[in-house]
Amino acid sequence: MPDVVGAGKTRWAWAVATFFGAGLLRPGPGTYGSVAAVLLWFGAAHWFHAAGVGLAVGTGAAALAATLIGIPAATVVAREVGREDPGFVVIDEVAGQWIALIAVRPDWKHAALALLLFRAFDIWKPWPIRRLERLPEGTGIVLDDVAAGALALALGLAVSRWV
């Protein structure tokens, strides 16, 4: 397990990249990152009584922020550990999961569907998602999950008519 707060580590990047420690949980840190994103989204939706366009805009803004902050954070952490795509970096799952949730009704059935679809696309990585992994450093780490989130959103919207 990585030493998150050890000497020579960039703390802000580790906090963001691991989504405040969710990526340090085992097994399946990516799933923990996605579940944390869904729980935060679900809690915020109900706390702020958000739905419809307001929830979609807020979720999209959160996904954009996670992407824009996540790329440099993932780059820093990957460099510090000397690995291309460390498994404990889960800000990419958070960004992708929030994209998958952009147009989802804030109920458990639709949230679970978005979670399952996103994790399936994130693990499977169909074309062109796999090609995005080849982008350099944090860009490749994050953008493949952003694309997986977009595919999960599209399929989720199609399927949600029957859920």
PLM region spans:
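Short Lys/Arg-rich amphipathic alpha-helical segments
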Residues: 25-44, 58-66
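Final/C-terminal transmembrane alpha-helix of multipass membrane proteins
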Residues: 145-161
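Interhelical loop and helix-boundary elements at the membrane-water interface
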Residues: 1-35, 53, 69-101, 120-150
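Active-site-proximal helix-loop elements at catalytic-domain edges
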Residues: 1-2, 58, 112-114
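Alpha-helical transmembrane segments of multi-pass membrane proteins
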Residues: 41-42, 63-72, 101-102, 114-123, ...
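Helix-coil boundary and interhelical linker segments in multi-pass alpha-helical membrane proteins
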Residues: 42-59, 100-110, 157-163
